[in-house]
C-alpha cells in the first residue's frame, strides 16, 4: 500500500509518501517546509503558524508527489496528524486532507502525532520494532513508554513540568542563544574545556534519588523546572561577577549533562524493569548527539541497542505520519466523517501504569 502523509501540528508544513507494510516500509519522498519566521519571536506564534501552513500545504504535497514520481491516483490512502498540537495549525492539515481524500475517493486515516514519532525510526532502522522502551522528547512532550507491540503503549513516566525541548529553549534564552535552543546549546556545551566530572557548573540531577524503587510515583517521571531555575541563578551570578562570557559554555554543558543523566537513568530503569533490550528515541531532542552517545553507552553495558532517527525524521515530518498511517490502515481504521483537530489527546492504545499517574 502507498500512503500520502500530511503533518501540520506545529511549525513545520510537511508531506511525504511511504509505501509497504508495517514490517517493511519504503520512504519514497519527504518534504518539510520549516517556518523560520518564528525565530524572530523566540517561539512559535500560533496564528502565524496557521497562516504559513495555508501558504505551504499545496506546494508541499505537490513536491512530495513529484519527488516520489507518483500521482494522487497512485495513492491508496491519505494519513494526517489530527492530534495533539496547535488547533489552528492542525485544522489546516486535517481540512486539506479531508478534502483531498473526498475528492479522490481515498480512505482518510487520522494519526496521533506522538505515535508518528514512534514509527519515524522504523523507516530507517527496520530492527526498531517492538518490544522496546521508547523515549519521546520534544519541545512539547517528554514521555517514557513501554511498547510491547505496535498499538500497545504503556505510559511509565513523563515530565511533571517543562518538556525537555522547552527547557532547552528557555535555557538557551537565558544564555543569549537563538531559538530553537537545542542545537545551539549542544554546540556551546561541546566547547566546554573542563572534564565532565570537574567543570564548575554541575547541577543537581532532578528526581534521581538512589533510594528510589519502581513502586515510587516518581521512579520514571522527570522534572526540569528546578534545573532551569538553577541555571538562572548561575547566569545571574556570572553576570554579577562579569564572567558570563567565560561561563556560558560551562553552564550549557552542566545543564545538558544534567538533562542527559536524568533521561538515561530513567530509560535504563524502564528497560531493566520491563526486560527490554531495545530503546527507541523520538522527537526533536533525540537529535542531540551527546544524548544518543550516553544512551548507547548505557544500553551497551546491558547488551542492548539504541535506535534514533536521523535529524530529518526526528523533528516533525509527514513521513512518520504516513508510516503510522500504514499501520492504522492495515488495521482497518479510518476517519469518521466528523473527524476534527484536537489539541490534546492520549495516544490510541495507551494505558497509564499506576506509577505514571
UniProtKB/Swiss-Prot annotation:
PROSITE patterns: GLYCOPROTEASE (PS01016). Binds 1 Fe(2+) ion per subunit. It catalyses: L-threonylcarbamoyladenylate + adenosine(37) in tRNA = N(6)-L-threonylcarbamoyladenosine(37) in tRNA + AMP + H(+). The keyword Cytoplasm applies. Its cofactor is Fe(2+). SUPFAM superfamilies: Actin-like ATPase domain. It comes from the Bacteria. GO terms for cellular component: cytoplasm. Fe cation binds at residues 113, 117, 316. The keyword Metal-binding applies. It is found in: Cytoplasm. GO terms for molecular function: iron ion binding; N(6)-L-threonylcarbamoyladenine synthase activity. Required for the formation of a threonylcarbamoyl group on adenosine at position 37 (t(6)A37) in tRNAs that read codons beginning with adenine. Is involved in the transfer of the threonylcarbamoyl moiety of threonylcarbamoyl-AMP (TC-AMP) to the N6 group of A37, together with TsaE and TsaB. TsaD likely plays a direct catalytic role in this reaction. Belongs to the KAE1 / TsaD family. This is tRNA N6-adenosine threonylcarbamoyltransferase.
Amino acid at each position: 500500500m502507498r500512503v500520502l502523509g500530511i503533518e501540520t501540528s506545529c511549525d513545520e508544513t510537511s508531506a511525504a509518501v511511504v509505501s509497504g507494510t508495517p514490517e517493511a516500509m519504503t520512504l519514497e519522498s519527504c518534504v518539510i517546509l520549516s517556518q523560520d519566521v518564528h525565530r524572530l519571536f523566540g517561539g512559535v506564534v500560533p496564528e502565524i503558524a496557521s497562516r504559513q501552513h495555508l501558504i505551504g500545504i499545496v506546494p508541499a504535497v505537490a513536491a512530495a508527489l513529484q519527488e516520489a514520481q507518483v500521482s494522487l491516483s497512485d495513492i491508496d490512502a491519505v494519513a494526517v496528524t489530527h492530534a495533539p498540537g496547535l488547533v489552528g495549525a492542525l485544522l489546516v492539515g486535517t481540512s486539506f486532507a479531508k478534502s483531498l481524500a473526498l475528492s479522490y475517493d481515498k480512505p482518510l486515516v487520522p494519526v496521533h502525532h506522538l505515535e508518528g514519532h514512534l514509527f519515524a525510526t522504523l523507516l530507517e532502522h527496520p530492527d526498531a520494532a517492538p518490544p522496546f522502551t521508547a523515549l519521546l522528547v520534544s519541545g512539547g512532550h517528554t514521555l517514557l513508554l513501554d511498547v510491547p507491540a505496535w498499538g500497545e503503549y504503556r505510559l511509565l513516566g513523563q515530565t511533571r513540568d517543562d518538556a525537555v525541548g522547552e527547557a532547552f529553549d528557555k535555557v538557551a534564552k537565558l544564555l543569549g542563544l537563538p531559538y530553537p535552543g537545542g542545537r545551539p546549546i549542544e554546540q556551546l556545551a561541546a566547547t566546554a574545556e573542563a572534564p565532565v566530572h570537574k567543570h564548575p557548573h554541575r547541577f543537581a540531577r532532578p528526581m534521581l534519588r538512589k533510594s528510589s524503587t519502581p513502586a515510587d510515583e516518581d521512579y520514571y517521571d522527570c522534572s526540569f523546572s528546578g534545573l532551569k531555575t538553577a541555571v538562572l541563578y548561575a547566569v545571574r551570578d556570572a553576570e554579577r561577577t562579569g564572567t558570563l562570557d567565560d561561563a556560558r559554555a560551562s553552564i550549557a554543558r552542566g545543564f545538558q549533562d544534567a538533562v542527559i543523566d536524568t533521561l538515561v537513568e530513567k530509560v535504563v530503569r524502564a528497560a531493566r524493569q520491563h526486560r527490554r533490550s531495545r530503546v527507541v528515541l523520538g522527537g526533536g531532542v533525540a537529535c542531540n548527539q551527546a544524548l544518543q552517545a550516553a544512551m548507547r553507552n548505557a544500553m551497551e553495558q546491558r547488551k542492548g541497542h539504541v535506535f534514533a532517527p536521523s535529524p530529518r525524521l526526528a523533528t516533525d515530518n509527514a513521513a512518520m505520519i504516513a508510516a503510522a498511517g500504514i499501520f492504522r490502515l492495515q488495521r482497518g481504521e479510518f476517519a469518521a466523517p466528523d473527524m476534527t483537530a484536537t489539541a490534546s489527546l492520549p495516544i490510541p492504545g495507551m494505558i497509564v501504569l499506576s506509577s505514571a499517574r
